Amino acid sequence: MNKKFTDLAKKSKVIVIKVGSNILVNEKHTLRKKWLATLVDDVQKLQKKGSKVIIVSSGAIALGRDILSKKKLTNLHEKQAAASIGQIQLSQQWQKAFAKLKIQSSQILITAEDLNERRKYLNIRNTIFSLMDLNVVPIINENDTTSTEEIRFGDNDKLSAMITNALSAELLILLSDVDGLYTANPKKSTQAKLITDVTEINHDLEKYIDKDLSEFGSGGMQAKVNAAKLCIQSGSTMIISNGLVNNPLGNIHPKSSTWFLPSKNILTSRQQWIWNRPIQKAILHIDEGAAKALKKNSSLLAIGVKAIEGRFYRGDT
């Protein structure tokens, strides 16, 4: 492992690793078992250095589609059916890979609604902490079978960032089919240059984002940068690195990946939860004075509210 990455990993008590469908599943739509074994080997090395590791794994829909012999899933219900079939195989393969190294793993399926409700959010967080205390590696995925179109995470990049925030993890690693964020799509332009360090996500940076989605995934680079926004506000480092190689964690290098560095202005745990909630039930429009007050962590007074969209209920935040 590269020294800079090794030093960061040593300082990271909790590390979240997101594995996308496009690197977990090959062009024949089957699981890359040999590659998975090398990733699990990397995870064990991180554990031996003292880090707790959480995996956010896509792949259920892609695997289920192959089992159903469907070239294309045309609607949400077909995707949910594929997910319910593929999730069993996905979980089994993770369990087998970790078991070979005598590491216990577990499965957690989460919906956006689970993280939107404070009580459920805290319960999920406490469950994951308990699993980590038992040296169990949680394998997390969105519960695609029960999620609805209107209230889905949409991509596991966002889910992994929210898990990172919930656990106050120091590091999130997004394993992708590209090295990181480029000034242009490297698959389309020979002039594309890799951006290795990002200290601020602004308009100048976002203009480089290619809007294309992956074949199996639903996010693309835009989703990864959105995930980075969530991470850096909570004081976490996020790395986008090429996961197609064997031992993908061992091959992370600062010159061939993109590192999003933590913001100096870190939100509190509750502020992170409010800011990152996947479901917004209603919207408050406030005046300039109220906006300035909130930026200083002052209270919002009724006089500063100009309009309300939707409906708030008791307990909403």
Segments the model singles out, each with a brief description of its role:
Residues 1-104, 108-317:
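C-terminal catalytic "cap/lid" subdomain
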